[in-house]
Curated annotation (Swiss-Prot):
Its EC number is 3.6.5.n1. SMART domains: EFG_C (SM00838). It catalyses: GTP + H2O = GDP + phosphate + H(+). GTP binds at residues 14-19, 131-134. PROSITE patterns: G_TR_1, G_TR_2. The keyword Transcription does not apply. This is Elongation factor 4. It comes from Burkholderia mallei (strain ATCC 23344). The lineage of its organism: Bacteria, Pseudomonadati, Pseudomonadota, Betaproteobacteria, Burkholderiales. GO terms for biological process: positive regulation of translation.
Length: 597
């Protein structure tokens, strides 16, 4: 066991994490040069294209060190994005060490810091690495100062390398072996294995990626998952050297996979403990929690006959993404669709993009909403994730909305504009620190404000230099109201929005004005109203199209003209009673685009 090293790589987007992983795999001969491709561990096209890692992957490598010993290195590739922070914490708890990769030309960024703190809390040894030192803009001294300043770990002897050219990659592995402790654990103790990730394979069912903490696991043994108490027979165990390779057994300290014919991904929860069914471990490994969706949105097929196809697509996606939740929902305006829950905004974008790409769906998405805690007047508390399900104002005692703590990092030139943005979004400043040229701002902001367009606005006010990460803090009582949109007196459920009272007038007026531009003129007058409960706060009219019925009366008597106009009026009135206004799909997207000016 002294020759095993389990490590992962922490880095901000585009700091070269996947490239470094590629080089390490190549150096250790995990794949022949023919099979080598860039970003080996990012298996989804979407991961490659966006340059992000979504699912955790592993590679078991053998490396002959300079001291002549052969070491087994287990590389656990972690997602770097804040939406997947729970997965990151599971991946990190399976490791003893982490390479902190920092781009020498850019310095420290928000997500690096967030994941690095997670690593330090879990007691993982962090080894700093400066990447991209072949760039003319590289400034290693500055980057080292930032690592020491912002994260507070000693970085004087940080390894300098360039993953692109392969320069210094061996030094990275050497310092990894020197600094990271070997895994602790007893191969003879009762089995305890941590599920780092799981995914669905069409041939063998669910594949679980595990780190064996104690004990030994062999094929044909019966295992039990401690969170659900379900039992299965193990069919295969093995490791990935990115390609899968079956082994006789997996023992303490190793990272590998278990295949045991599980059909449902929801059975193999990330962070759960696997143990023997016959002599189970006395207690599960700490840190397991159920992942709860934070952001909800409605997904509807553009064509009504695509509903079944959408359901199948969601089921298939759910096989590989246990944190996605969905339930059927009917909207008067959009027909049949699903209400889906996501971990965060990036997760939502990815799910939408995969549905459109891999399953050729055409989708309409409603405005993303967050979950509100509503205390009703009879004292019961309900969770409302859909504005249409919000009770009547008279039955509500108080509404609590989710508050998140946001950490923002930016160069000091942009502090003013970022603070202005946070104030607009009802944020309260908690902290502000200067680290050299970088500034760290900490804010508490209602999640609903972040969901809409905070990230895009942040990037635009800081010219792309600011980075952020957020985590849920608590539910807090707030004065939020539900604004309904009425068209000719009928509520349109899909257009309801929940906003803070201070912004309700403005948002109501904006949406109404936007709808007026979008809805085509009808043969009769259309009234668009925004209402809070029974109180109308905004109104726009769309004038009717009318034929000039007086065209054929030259001169003539006024009573004749009056008669014709009255007759036209009667007709319009009748039309209005039976006519229904078609709402074009752009109207639903318009709500999303009502920015806070």
């Amino acid at each position: 066991m002294d020759h095993i090293r389990n490590f992962s790589i922490i880095a901000h987007i585009d700091h070269g994490k996947s490239t470094l992983a590629d080089r390490i795999i190549q150096l250790c001969g995990g794949l022949s040069d023919r099979e080598m491709e860039s970003q080996v561990l990012d298996s989804m096209d979407l991961e490659r294209e966006r340059g992000i890692t979504i699912k955790a992957q592993t590679a078991a490598l053998t490396y002959r060190a300079r001291d002549g010993k052969v070491y087994n290195l287990n590389l656990i590739d972690t997602p770097g994005h804040v939406d997947f922070s729970y997965e990151v914490s599971r991946s990190l708890s399976a490791c003893e060490g982490a390479l902190l990769v920092v781009d020498a030309s850019q310095g420290v960024e928000a997500q690096t810091v967030a994941n690095c703190y997670t690593a330090i809390e879990l007691g993982v040894e962090v080894v700093p690495v400066l990447n991209k030192i072949d760039l003319p803009a590289a400034n290693p001294e500055n980057a080292i100062a930032e690592i020491e300043d912002v994260i507070g770990i000693d970085a004087m002897d940080a390894v300098r390398c360039s993953a692109k050219t392969g320069l210094g990659v061996e030094d990275v592995l050497e310092s990894l072996i020197a600094k990271v402790p070997p895994p602790k654990g007893d191969p003879d103790a009762p089995l305890q294995a941590l599920i780092i990730d799981s995914w669905f394979d069409n041939y063998v069912g669910v594949v679980m990626l595990v780190r064996i903490v104690n004990g030994t696991l062999r094929p044909k043994e019966r295992i039990k998952l401690m969170a659900t108490d379900a039992q299965y027979a193990v069919e295969h165990v093995g490791v990935f050297t990115p390609k899968s390779r079956n082994l006789e057994s997996l023992s303490a300290g190793q990272v590998g996979f278990i295949i045991s014919g599980i059909k449902e991904l929801t059975a193999a929860k990330v962070g759960d403990t696997v143990t023997h069914a016959t002599k189970p471990a006395p207690e599960p490994l700490p840190g397991f929690k159920e992942v709860k969706p934070q952001v909800f949105a409605g997904l509807y097929p553009v064509e009504a006959n695509q509903y079944d196809a959408l359901r199948e697509s969601l089921e298939k996606l759910k096989l590989n993404d246990a944190s996605l939740q969905y339930e059927p929902e009917v909207s008067q305006a959009l027909g049949f669709g699903f209400r889906c829950g996501f971990l965060g905004l990036l997760h939502m974008e990815i799910v939408q993009e995969r549905l459109e790409r891999e399953f050729d769906m055409d989708l309409i998405t409603t405005a993303p909403t967050v979950v509100y805690e509503v205390v009703q007047s009879d004292g019961t508390t309900i969770m409302v994730e859909n504005p249409a399900k919000m009770p009547e104002p008279a039955r509500i005692a108080e509404i609590r909305e989710p508050i998140v703590t946001v950490n923002l990092y930016m160069p000091q030139d942009y502090v003013g504009s970022v603070i202005t943005l946070c104030e607009q979004k009802r944020g309260t400043q908690i902290n502000m620190q200067y680290h050299g040229r970088q500034v760290q701002l900490t804010y508490e902001i209602p999640m609903a404000e972040i969901v809409l367009d905070f990230f895009d606005r942040l990037k635009s006010v800081s010219r792309g230099y600011a980075s952020m990460d957020y985590e849920f803090k608590e539910y807090r009582t707030s004065d939020v109201v539900k604004v309904d949109m009425l068209i000719n007196g009928d509520k349109v459920d899909a257009l309801s929005i929940i906003v803070h009272r201070s912004q309700s007038q403005y948002r109501g007026r904006e949406v109404a004005a936007k709808m007026r531009e979008i809805i085509p003129r009808q043969m009769y007058d259309v009234a668009i109203q925004a209402a809070i409960g029974a109180h109308i706060i905004a109104r726009e009219n769309i004038k009717a199209l009318r034929k000039n019925v007086l065209a054929k009366c030259y001169g003539g008597d006024i009573t004749r003209k009056k008669k014709l106009l009255e007759k036209q009026k009667e007709g319009k009135k009748r039309m209005k009673q039976v006519g229904s206004v078609e709402i074009p799909q752009e109207a639903f997207l318009a709500i999303l685009r009502v920015e806070d000016k």
